[in-house]
């Protein structure tokens, strides 16, 4: 909290030790629910795929490549030009774009009656306005998402009524079936490179070195641990009169060495795609130390990571490109799986989707989900709670019956004396579980004593909820005393006995933690004999 520096300097000159010790009063005492680890500074994290993309961008640029964005939507005729006789096989794996046709809607007398019933009497002029707007929509002058607002503005009626009118009067809009176009979503980055390079030659002369990292789409039969229907391709091209296969090898090593790969093996690719010159299509295998001994088929450290080749003159000629072009491509997700030690591309890409990944919640995360339910709402109430805890710490082992005054003052306009009591004989002021602390340990949430048996559980301070049973009970007692003061009671006693569930000691566990613990077959074990009471006497 804020303080007066001049007063502090004056007090320090008079009595330095006293002023120094008084400094504790300047530091706010957090409430139980404000304590660490519930008070935390969150930080953002990059998605592993986007993190890998950024690293690839930097790696390419360090090698002197310039970034380019290639067309994502490619007409099927481009695929025929690039792939020749392979085009149909390639198109079989492409997603075609489709759109809803725009119906030619008529307005009969029956429909006019329905419109009038919904919108009221808008007259012939209003019907004509609807006709004009529908005609403009049919001609493409109005976009689909603007049709309702346009009719609404023309008729000066609400959007909701117009939407209801279209839904009930014009069923044609609900019966529309998408019609496929000849445009596809790019399945290979190559589809975009031919278009970009052909256009660029009209304005610039090679040599060129470009890279592009962007989405591609493939109509796979199904997605599995190693393939998705949409993925990122990190592709580059070198256009130069003297470019050779060796440039592909050099780029492979230069790029992949920046990601920890140490050895390289180049093998002719058996696929022999028609857009590459025969015998230039090459698979790149690389050795990465992180893979050695892993639980994967790459435990020997070797993995196929890229493919390169020289574009075929027959494909380049379709775009009037007279220069050789070396192209290299690699899947970003495969590289990300190596860098982030991920066994499944689905869980790597979509970790938020339960069907793709195991839910893992840290002990620290579980501890953040433990809260005190009822808290005092006044400064005096907070003082009462602290005083109750202090008396229990001082006299918890005292034999009963016993009573210890804890706090005296005014609460909600009424004077009150607060004591910690244990009226029963042959016991103690506090039961043996009173000072148990809530800790998350190995996926469980436990209420346990801080002793040698549980030393391992208490070593991780970020997994300690920072709440003892007696503190949670004292908070409840203080809140009840505040309520008793406002209700006009003369006396109020708050008791706690054997705790069997968190709510009996004024604790609540967040719903997220409860779902996690239930799903993982873990446990919430907060129980034990607390046995103490707090008495408030009002004047």
UniProtKB/Swiss-Prot annotation:
Pfam family, one: SepRS_C
Keywords: Aminoacyl-tRNA synthetase, ATP-binding, Ligase, Nucleotide-binding, Protein biosynthesis
Name of the top EC class for this enzyme: ligase
Annotated binding of substrate, by residue: 188-190, 233-235, 275-276, 327
Family matches, as InterPro entries: aa-tRNA-synth_II, aa-tRNA-synth_II/BPL/LPL, O-Pseryl-tRNA(Cys)_ligase, Phenylalanyl-tRNA_Synthase, SepRS_C
Tagged with keyword Cell inner membrane: no
Superkingdom, taxonomy of origin: Archaea
GO biological process, one term: translation
EC number(s) on file: 6.1.1.27
Reactions that this protein is recorded to catalyse: tRNA(Cys) + O-phospho-L-serine + ATP = O-phospho-L-seryl-tRNA(Cys) + AMP + diphosphate
One GO MF term attached to the UniProt entry: tRNA binding
Homology family: Belongs to the class-II aminoacyl-tRNA synthetase family. O-phosphoseryl-tRNA(Cys) synthetase subfamily.
NCBIfam families the record matches: sepS
Function: Catalyzes the attachment of O-phosphoserine (Sep) to tRNA(Cys).
Subunit structure: Homotetramer. Interacts with SepCysS.
Protein name per Swiss-Prot or TrEMBL: O-phosphoserine--tRNA(Cys) ligase
Organism listed in the record: Methanosarcina mazei (strain ATCC BAA-159 / DSM 3647 / Goe1 / Go1 / JCM 11833 / OCM 88)
